[in-house]
Amino acid sequence: MLKELAENQFSFLGFYERRVKRILPALYFVITACIFSGWFLLDPFELKELSQSIFATSIFSSNVYFYLKHGYFDVSSELKPLLHTWSLGVEEQFYLIFPISLFLLLKLGRGFAVAIYVILFLFSLLLASSLVEENSAFAFYMLPTRAWEL
């Protein structure tokens, strides 16, 4: 992306199209498998939970859903087949914000953009470190505390 921006060849449409082609086929396969197996294996309450997590996963917000509803290491986590998609939610939220912010910040200068991202990186790392004890679920699931890893 940086190379494309430097060469004035970056396309938001192309960037997001590549993400869609890379992520959606496998995601749709997993969701379809969960629907099919859930129909036969889960009781009505668990099926309702599955449908909610499918919706959240479909709009790339499963990290928020699982943060609000469950803990990653709950006893019943084996009954949440889409629990692992929390990281996909974080990644896609990052992909929504990063290209646009990078494009805008580079208009103010490369040094300025680098400085802002260093500050945001450090803020994210410090926030994650400080919340591990107080709110470990937020520190685990949410973009502000995971952005430094991306």
Task: Identify the meaning behind each predicted range.
Residues 1-150:
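Membrane-interface helix/loop caps of multi-pass membrane proteins
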